[in-house]
Regions:
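Extreme N-terminal starter segment of soluble prokaryotic enzymes
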Residues: 6-11
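Active-site-lining helix/loop region of Rossmann-like oxidoreductase modules
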Residues: 14, 22, 120-121, 126-270
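Hydrophobic/small residue at the entry helix of a nucleotide-binding pocket
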Residues: 19
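NAD(P)-binding Rossmann-fold cofactor-contacting core
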Residues: 30-48
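Short acidic low-complexity segments
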Residues: 52-64
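ADP-ribose/adenylate-binding Rossmann-like module
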Residues: 74, 85-104
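Rossmann-fold NAD(P)-binding glycine/threonine-rich loop
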Residues: 97-118
Length: 270
């Protein structure tokens, strides 16, 4: 017996990139009905398989009567599409939570969710132990440090911009050190994990981030260290890259699947 199984639901995906495509396939395998929101002329339309409906506008998607919206299209979608979803009273699960480094945007989305009966759901995606960070967020002197360590294939363009040959990199290169707010703004497609830590814990300014490209890395590694009056936490997660997008971890789409099914489940682990 699968204690997490839920009855078929109607899910609207914003976008159809690598993560959304993996999530769509997993949802459909479990019997859920999927529609994707893609503007007319989007090249992603060519990748959408039979059995997945396509809507060009949110008005068109509304005829599908989605029970949950899942954003998997990047910061621009969070700014431009998610507000309209929330104003319609729809629950929205956001994967590109790095967009919320913009405090005004976060306040706007939270306000829309509260005033229209929707819900703003923030995905943890590739990172574990956020429950510990949330529990310690009120502690005096909470410090949180995060390091992202990925192989050169994940940072090829960034390495070339710095004058490095990704295929000939001999030693680790630190691409970034700073706050989670700076990281989310600098790498909108890559550091949603840093934003998740900041939102769960001490905030974007107090969460420290380092981004390292390592030729010896065999996967996408996330290391987190948190310290407070309650104790010390240190965790390292080595995720395999997505087969279709080396910048992202393969587990992300499965994390979103788990979040979708937990949302509808009568039993919820908090």
């Amino acid at each position: 017996m699968d204690r997490n199984a839920v009855s078929p639901r109607r899910i609207l995906l914003i976008g159809y990139g690598a993560i959304a495509a993996e999530l769509s396939e997993a949802l459909r395998q479990r019997g859920h009905m999927v529609t994707t929101l893609l503007r007319a002329g989007s090249r992603s339309r060519e990748r959408v398989p039979e059995g997945v409906m396509i809507a060009a506008t949110l008005d068109e998607a509304a005829t599908f009567a989605p029970e949950l919206v899942v954003e998997a299209a990047g910061h621009e979608a969070v700014r431009e599409i998610v507000p309209d979803c929330l104003s319609r009273g729809l629950p929205v699960l956001i994967s590109s939570i790095g967009a919320l480094h913009d405090d005004l945007l976060f306040e706007r989305l939270a306000g829309l969710a509260g005033s229209h009966g929707g819900r703003l759901l923030l995905a943890s995606c590739a990172l574990g132990a956020l429950d510990y960070i949330r529990a310690a967020r009120a502690a005096d002197g909470l410090s949180v440090a995060y390091e992202s360590r990925k192989p050169p294939a994940a940072w090829a363009a960034e390495l070339r911009a710095l004058g490095h040959d990704p295929e000939a990199l001999a030693s680790p290169v630190t691409l970034f050190e700073g706050t989670a707010r700076e990281a989310a703004a600098a790498y909108p497609q890559n550091l949603n994990v840093a934003a998740a830590l900041a939102l769960a814990g001490p905030g974007f300014e107090a969460t420290r981030v380092a981004v390292v490209c390592d030729p010896d890395a065999t996967g996408n590694t996330h290391s987190v260290r948190a310290q407070s009056e309650y104790g010390t936490m240190a965790i390292t997660i080595a995720n395999r890259p997505s087969p279709t997008n080396p910048k992202s971890s393969w587990i992300v789409s499965r994390s979103l699947l788990a979040a979708v099914e937990q949302y509808f489940s009568p039993v919820v682990m908090l």
